[in-house]
Amino acid sequence: MIKNIILVIIIVGAAILVYIYMKKDTGEMKNVEMLARKGMSVIGGDIAYFGNVRGFYAYPEKEGEYPGVVMIHEWWGLNDNIKDMAQELAKEGYRVLAVDLFGKVAATPDEARAQTAGLDQTKALENLKAATNFLRQAGAPKVASLGWCFGGRQSVELAISGVKLDATVVYYGSGLATTVDKLKPIKWPVLGIFGDKDQSIPTETVRAFELSLNTLGIKNEIYIYPGVGHAFANPSGMNYAPEETKDAWAKTLAFLKESMIK
């Protein structure tokens, strides 16, 4: 009897560990519970913005003129965590369109890696520009881009594509453009959030990015958090750092308010 009880405990324990591991690998855990603040009542739902491509659009319920933010997902795709973050940002008085660059959500890191590797960058930029136009047509007087990881790089790619923005936010986007020549098109403030243990974006690369922005006279805020690695703001990842995530989000809100509302 005791052996049977022990066996059941082992099986249940193993199942729990597998569940936790799967949750960490799929990007489906959320930040919104920790970052939630009292704010405006918002409306959110799926909407077509680029042909048949549907994103998630969140905006304040009260009518008004609100700035817009193009929100760009990580390599997982447009999952529930990103949709919740869109609603959380909308509470602060923004029209937020969380784009979909893949058309599906990856279930494993291998799937995420494959869909990122197969991205058509030209089409991705068309997608992002359509999102920018959507927000302007919705009445946003100013538009910013904000992305994490894969989306962080795409946030910068949009900024240097020739489209007019009013602010750019990048969370640890690997493969960043760092040269003066490539960053020349940017004419607005940039916020960069990074970790000094991020092997995919060495501190030297971040400093090169910052130096080029300074050389071009582009107002910028670059933060490198000590002791944290890549995707530290992703609650599904092994590198998740809650306190740094809260601080980075507070800095993001302050930056957007300064750049878009004041």
Name every feature range the model reports, one short phrase each.
Residues M85, P202-S212:
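Short alpha-helix in the alpha/beta-hydrolase fold that links the catalytic acid
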Residues R136-W148:
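Alpha/beta-hydrolase fold nucleophile elbow
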Residues N214-K262:
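C-terminal catalytic histidine-bearing segment of alpha/beta-hydrolase fold enzymes
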Residues K164-S174:
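A conserved short beta-strand
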Residues G147-G151, S155:
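Gly/Ala-rich beta-loop-alpha elbow adjacent to hydrolase catalytic centers
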Residues I186, G192-F194:
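Short beta-strand/loop motif that positions the catalytic acidic residue
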Residues K197-I201:
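Acidic catalytic loop of the alpha/beta-hydrolase fold
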